[in-house]
């Protein structure tokens, strides 16, 4: 990287040449050194399966419980049944949408899902798959501020609406969506509500009881 500072017409100008800037940290970012130091023992020394009966697993099990309790407290979960641990957000989103499809659509009388045009690809791709299976999907557009109005969700709900899926924080713009208001609308209309809150965790207060 080459930084050039020059003075012209009593103004200083800063020039940067051959500089690479990584702008995808919301998707994947480097591990914080403090996190690396905290996890290193479990990569090299305490690597036993925490659910195993042997002593190597018994040594790691308390640490797993400690981490889970930290997670429960961080989102104000009432008990461990409020959380289902999955491998990643992709698995979680697929699990929810396809689970609703099987339970309420294939085995019920509801055939409609509402989502937005700016969801993460794990949502939009799954919705496209469900459309191929005959599910009706409504994609709501965003307003001038890059988010959606809760009223647009209310207006899109039909008698056969099974699920509303709206992200909390957009992974590209960082815009927050009014999920509390949307959730109340869904509750009032007896519609399931799902939010991909992946980008909100660690950035805003998350309270699953709120």
Which residues fall in each region the model found?
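Pyridoxal 5′-phosphate
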Residues: 4-210
């Amino acid at each position: 990287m080459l930084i050039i500072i020059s003075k012209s017409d009593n103004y200083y100008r800063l020039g940067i040449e051959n500089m690479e800037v990584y702008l995808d940290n919301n998707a994947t970012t480097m591990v914080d050194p403090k996190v690396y130091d905290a996890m290193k023992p479990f990569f090299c020394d305490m690597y036993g399966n925490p659910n195993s009966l042997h002593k190597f697993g018994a040594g790691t099990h308390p640490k797993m419980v400690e981490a889970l309790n930290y997670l429960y407290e961080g989102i104000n979960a009432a008990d461990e049944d409020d959380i289902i641990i999955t491998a990643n957000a992709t698995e979680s989103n697929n699990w929810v949408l396809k689970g609703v499809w099987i339970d309420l659509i294939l085995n019920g009388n509801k055939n409609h899902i509402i989502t937005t045009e700016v969801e993460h690809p794990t949502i939009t791709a799954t919705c496209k798959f469900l459309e191929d299976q005959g599910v009706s999907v409504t994609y709501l557009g965003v307003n001038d501020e890059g988010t959606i109005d809760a009223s647009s969700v209310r207006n899109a709900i039909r008698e056969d609406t099974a699920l509303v899926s709206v992200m909390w924080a957009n992974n590209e713009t960082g815009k927050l969506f009014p999920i509390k208001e949307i959730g109340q609308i869904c509750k009032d209309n007896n519609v399931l509500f799902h939010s991909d809150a992946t980008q909100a965790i660690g950035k805003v207060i998350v309270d699953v009881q709120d």
